[in-house]
């Protein structure tokens, strides 16, 4: 006959995330059967020490990934750009994707405060130790970091938050 087995322990998949993911949206949330969620309008995700706010967030819990971007308003200005905050710092960007499990991400249009200045960049890849690699970056101490009067143009850089910035070829740009 058949031997009856009692299930005494649920085997969690190695890909499972370790904590509850809290999420909200001011406008709407669309949840699908495939463990995916689309959040619209002042969206927020809170997971362990990570916080993400953006106008639009797409989340897939099967692959442990999240994608965030701003949305155009009635005159075409992008509003609600992603703001990512964790133990290593706070980052604003145009778009970002992030994996909860590996703690790695890909960011475009990054803006972050480092030491006494601002680092902005075209593309950045965040590593699991909190450091990130930036391509086509700018470092300035000018308060107007969107259109600085002076900056160091960095072809590539590795940033270790609150420690140092190591760059490849770079040059100083002065504007009138």
Feature locations, PLM:
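Structural signature for solvent-exposed beta-strand/loop edge elements and short helix-capping sites
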Residues: 3-176
């Amino acid at each position: 006959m058949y031997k009856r087995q009692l299930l005494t322990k649920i085997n969690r998949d190695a890909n499972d995330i370790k904590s509850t993911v809290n999420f909200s949206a001011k406008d709407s949330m669309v949840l699908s059967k495939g463990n995916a969620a689309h959040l619209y309008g002042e969206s927020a995700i809170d997971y362990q020490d990570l916080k993400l706010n953006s106008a639009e967030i797409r989340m897939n819990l099967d692959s442990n990934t999240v994608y965030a971007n701003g949305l155009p308003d009635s005159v075409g200005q992008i509003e609600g750009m992603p703001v990512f905050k964790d133990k290593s710092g706070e980052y604003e960007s145009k778009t970002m994707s992030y994996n909860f499990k590996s703690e790695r991400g890909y960011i475009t249009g990054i803006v972050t405060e480092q030491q006494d200045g601002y680092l902005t960049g075209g593309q950045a890849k965040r590593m699991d130790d909190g450091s990130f690699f930036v391509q086509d970056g700018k470092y300035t101490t000018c308060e107007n970091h969107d259109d600085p009067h002076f900056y160091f143009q960095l072809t590539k850089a590795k940033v270790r938050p609150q420690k140092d910035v190591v760059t490849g070829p770079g040059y100083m740009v002065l504007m009138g």
